[in-house]
Amino acid sequence: MSKFARGFAALVAATVLIATLGAAVGTAVAEENKPDRHAGYYYPPITSSETYEARAVAMADADRSQRIKFINNLTEQLLSRPYPPEYAIFAKGDEAQKMIIVGRRPGTFNTIYRARALLATLTAVARSSRLFNEFGVQEYFTFFDLAKLFGFSRITISDGESFTHQIHLK
């Protein structure tokens, strides 16, 4: 991709971001302040959290159906391996806007460092994806940005026992 095309793409992305930021901020704050009805059912109470300022904005066609297809594709990849998956990944919420990753074995993601190691691995996978390569963002975007492209508002990762970390995507 030429420098001009990259610059133009960045300008368009910045314009879209500025245009949507005002509407998104109010919705995101309301979402963050709601009680987490999935804590205590799919994972233990939140033990830590952070906010990620995404470099991406949701794609125009990002909807519930697209998010479910995305999760289904990830799950199919996990299940196609010759060994049992170490974690389950699924979407919840009225619009499937909440991504949840839960370890299936004791000690899998019981520290923030192990959780971040998985998220870094998912970033490496995302950066090799056709989508990132088509947009020319494989050096800049992370797995969090990929989740934002699909319209996810948060990612929760847990060991399923005592540790749960939640990332709010802005």
Question: What kind of feature is each model-predicted range?
Answer:
Residues L78-T142:
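Mature extracytoplasmic domains of secretory-pathway proteins
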Residues A28-Q97, G107-N110:
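N-proximal, solvent-exposed amphipathic alpha-helical segments enriched in charged/polar residues
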Residues S2-T15:
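Bacterial N-terminal signal peptides that target proteins for export
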Residues L17-T27:
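C-terminal segment of classical bacterial N-terminal signal peptides
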Residues T20, K92, D145-A147:
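Generic marker of residues within folded, mature protein domains
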Residues A30, T121-V125, K170:
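Ampiphathic alpha-helical segments that act as solvent-exposed interaction surfaces
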Residues R127-L169:
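A short amphipathic beta-strand at an alpha->beta junction
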